């Protein structure tokens, strides 16, 4: 399938899922429910893995449950990285907690799952500066915020408000020699020491008498 060039940033990130309506994702077009696989592609692209958009799309479409009617469930996002033998830290908590974790670990990139307006949504972010506070580049966040640079605290304030649970994925990298041995290692020296296990799970904060969808649908308002 041909990709509308308007979906891309100049350096090859997918910045706007609205231009991917010709990519069916379960029952719906990617423009409606494909934020999950778009975020994974951006994280892969940021890591320099050289993977094609179509390869990520096909891999995610193959493991997508419920015909995409629930968007991309969080466990499906994790499954993608596990099947690719990429170590992944999986973290749950409030917006404040996750901002702190990203800051303290100096994570170079990651994926956030949160509520944009009333819709569950995934975005990828990439660290672009080491100044204090660090600045990050965010992709496919909302209309008018398809590709922008800001602090994580700004993003929390504007997009992670309330007491809803936020989910964070911090994918690592593989060494070529480790892959040959069938083993995987997180090799980003700046932050690997903060992620001692392949899966880090923090206590889940839940609101009483409330329901939060577990998927990612749409790109927000």
Describe every region a protein language model picked out:
Residues 1-67, 192, 206-207, 218:
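Active-site-adjacent structural segments surrounding the nucleophilic cysteine of cysteine proteases
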Residues 3, 10, 15-17, 21, ...:
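Intrinsic-disorder/low-complexity regions
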Residues 55-174, 185-188, 198, 209-210:
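Conserved active-site-adjacent core of cysteine acyl-enzyme catalytic domains
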Residues 178-180, 189, 221:
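Ala/Thr-enriched low-complexity intrinsically disordered regions
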